[in-house]
């Protein structure tokens, strides 16, 4: 893929997430053999940790929509190469079950091959996320 193709794929992912597209529509951007990694307190929230397969993204979309109210989600920049896009931004979310809010900067690293996302890695303030979830 070219740098522009990778950038467009990252933008399409963000667009689908922001438009409340169905989880299966979002998942079509991802490989069946997706590697999913959000470092942090595994068990605090169902999407934290290492997972494999396209179900990781559908589960994330479904679970996060059910459990979290998005307050803000701001993309500050998208950096792209032929096989990787890095989305830099900040977010604030409220956990529905306890009303706690987390505010954090983030980096989402999307690795792409053959026109689809093969690896999703999110870096955020995992300590703050854990405190919100366990709080």
Predicted region positions:
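A general alpha-helical scaffold signature found inside nucleotide-binding enzyme cores
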Residues: 8, 52-56, 105
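A solvent-exposed, acidic/Ser-Thr-rich amphipathic alpha-helical stretch
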Residues: 31-77, 82
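Hydrophobic pocket/interface hotspot
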Residues: 13, 26, 34, 53, ...
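Short, flexible active-site loop motifs that bind/organize anionic cofactors or intermediates
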Residues: 16, 47, 119
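Short acidic-aromatic low-complexity motifs
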Residues: 2-35
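A beta-strand edge to alpha-helix "cap/lid" segment located at domain peripheries
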Residues: 2-5, 62-135
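Residue-level recognition of oxygen-bearing side chains
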Residues: 22, 56, 125-128
């Amino acid at each position: 893929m070219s740098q522009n193709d990778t950038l467009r794929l990252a933008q399409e992912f963000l667009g689908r997430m922001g438009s409340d597209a169905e989880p299966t529509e979002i998942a079509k951007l991802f490989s069946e053999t997706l590697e999913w990694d959000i470092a942090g307190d595994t068990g605090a929230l169902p999407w934290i940790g290492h997972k494999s397969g396209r179900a990781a993204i559908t589960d994330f979309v479904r679970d996060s929509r059910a459990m979290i109210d998005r307050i803000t989600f701001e993309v500050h920049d998208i950096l792209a190469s032929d096989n990787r896009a890095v989305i830099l931004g900040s977010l604030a979310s409220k956990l529905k079950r306890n009303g706690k809010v987390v505010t954090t900067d983030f980096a989402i690293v999307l690795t792409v091959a053959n026109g689809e996302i093969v690896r999703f890695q999110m870096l955020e303030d995992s300590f703050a996320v854990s405190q919100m979830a366990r709080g």
